[in-house]
Each structure stands twice: as structure tokens, then as C-alpha cells.
Curated annotation (Swiss-Prot):
InterPro entries linked: EGD2/NACA0like, NAC-like_UBA, NAC_A/B_dom_sf, Nas_poly-pep-assoc_cplx_dom
Name recorded for this polypeptide: Nascent polypeptide-associated complex subunit alpha
The family this protein is said to belong to: Belongs to the NAC-alpha family.
Compartments, record wording: Cytoplasm; Nucleus
Gene behind the chain: EGD2
SMART domains: NAC (SM01407)
Length: 180
């Protein structure tokens, strides 16, 4: 069959001479062809992806795979940038729609959720610090060097360090473990 005889729009793949030889050798190795695979991707450093659409995949008895097809390079950084741009456009459209009278919908974007979580964690941290730093703490019976070491290691207030030392009867290791 020549190229002129192939009907227009037919799904025909033309194999190179080297690929034909490789396929013949694969048949001699008794590899099993795996049907139903539509895409194979290979990931490399820097979010670089090699993608093969509609591949011919063969599996050996040892569990290795041989993949035939046209490899295309996908740059994940570019895809991520495009996705972020689309997300920004959708956010702008939803804000514009919200201003026209569709109020009541909550913002469920990733940035909004992250901001809400950070705000909540900052509020709880402030409350805890206010409770702990109510005034001077009685350090009698404890070594000042131990308190300084705990404050330095765990980055907590002096009052919390004293409280942890008192709970653990002056044991620095357990106090540090509790605070970190």
C-alpha cells in the first residue's frame, strides 16, 4: 500500500526503518503488549516531562517496560503558570460577578483558604502568648542557665520554659521535648 492509497483522515502511523527493526526484535523477546494505555510520562528534574500519547507498551517477564511512540516535551513550569493565569482570570470574573449582586458565596480559592488558616493560627498564638506572659514568673528552685537553654532551643517565652521545667521537675530534656 502506498501513501496515495491511504484515505484522508485515516489514523495511520508511519514507522521508521529503525523502529521497524526494533519492533521485530521485541517480538522475538516474547514481550506482552499492554492494551489500554493512552499516555506515558517520564519526569525529569526541573519539572520537565516527556510525554508519549497513544504509546505501544510492552512488558517483560522481569517487570521492565518498553515504550514506543512519539515523545513530546512538556514544561510543567509553563503549565503551572498558565493554570495560575486562568485561576486569576476566574477569580477576577467571580469578584466582578460578586459585585453585581451575587454576594453570599464564600471565596474557596487556595489563597483565601491559606490566608484564613494563617489568620486563625496567629490569633491562637496571640491568645497563648497573652496567657503565658501575664507577669513575672517565680523561678525559685530552678537554675537560670537551664531556663535560658530551653528558651534558646525552643524559641518560647521564659514563662513557658519555667512552666515546662516545673511540670517535669527540672528535667530539661522532657521540658524541651514538650515545647518543641
Amino acid at each position: 500500500m502506498s501513501i496515495e492509497e491511504i484515505p484522508q483522515g485515516a489514523d495511520v502511523s508511519i514507522l521508521s526503518k529503525n523502529e521497524k527493526k526494533a519492533r521485530e526484535l521485541i517480538k522475538k523477546l516474547n514481550l506482552k503488549q499492554i492494551k489500554g494505555i493512552t499516555r506515558v510520562t517520564f519526569k525529569q528534574r526541573g519539572n520537565l516531562i516527556y510525554a508519549i500519547d497513544q504509546p505501544d507498551v510492552f512488558r517483560s517477564s522481569a517487570g521492565t517496560y518498553v515504550v514506543f511512540g512519539e515523545a513530546k516535551v512538556d514544561d510543567m513550569n509553563k503549565r503551572i503558570a498558565e493554570a495560575q493565569q486562568q485561576q486569576a482570570q476566574q477569580d477576577a470574573l467571580s469578584k466582578a460577578a460578586g459585585e453585581t449582586g451575587e454576594a453570599g458565596e464564600e471565596d474557596k480559592s487556595q489563597d483565601a483558604i491559606t490566608a484564613d488558616l494563617e489568620k486563625a493560627s496567629l490569633n491562637t498564638n496571640k491568645i497563648e502568648e497573652e496567657e503565658a506572659d501575664d507577669g513575672e514568673v517565680d523561678e525559685s528552685g530552678l537554675d537560670a542557665k537551664d531556663i535560658d537553654i530551653i528558651v534558646e532551643q525552643t524559641q518560647v517565652s521564659r514563662a513557658k520554659a519555667v512552666k515546662a521545667l516545673r511540670v517535669h521537675d527540672g528535667d530539661m530534656v522532657n521540658a524541651i521535648m514538650e515545647l518543641s
